[in-house]
UniProtKB/Swiss-Prot annotation:
Protein's UniProt name: Peptidyl-prolyl cis-trans isomerase-like 1
One cellular component (GO) term of this entry: catalytic step 2 spliceosome
Name of the gene this protein is made from: PPIL1
Pathological condition linked to this protein in its record: Pontocerebellar hypoplasia 14: A form of pontocerebellar hypoplasia, a disorder characterized by structural defects of the pons and cerebellum, evident upon brain imaging. PCH14 is a severe autosomal recessive form characterized by progressive microcephaly, and poor or absent psychomotor development with severely impaired intellectual development apparent from birth. Other features may include hypotonia, spastic quadriplegia, and early-onset seizures. Early death may occur in some patients.
Keyword Phosphoprotein: yes
Amino acid sequence: MAAIPPDSWQPPNVYLETSMGIIVLELYWKHAPKTCKNFAELARRGYYNGTKFHRIIKDFMIQGGDPTGTGRGGASIYGKQFEDELHPDLKFTGAGILAMANAGPDTNGSQFFVTLAPTQWLDGKHTIFGRVCQGIGMVNRVGMVETNSQDRPVDDVKIIKAYPSG
């Protein structure tokens, strides 16, 4: 297993080169340091390369980060699921919010989502750890692709390459 980077390693952004364009994500290290480290390090290791946005719900969110593409896979850099980092100042107030997908409290792994609209019912249930700082138009276009009855895109939308800045 690769070493976990030191606490001093805090790249401000992660870039997602997708089959539909580039998304630049700003990370909220002050509010969710463990989650940011997990996401940035998985990106640095190439974990997200070649994965797809496996769940897309119009006017709600786009979800990715599962190497199996099923919505049931993925692991953190910590070797297991890890705890939520819920911050009272961070709310699901609009489009472009980056958060961890989970299966209940303290079940974070590698899957993440980006909101397409305000989703206040998620406040206090998912760790918010960043936002889209470039490419929100591209995120919105991903949110409009045709999906099947299980919210899976008919045509794959892939993360070709993910990498941290610096």
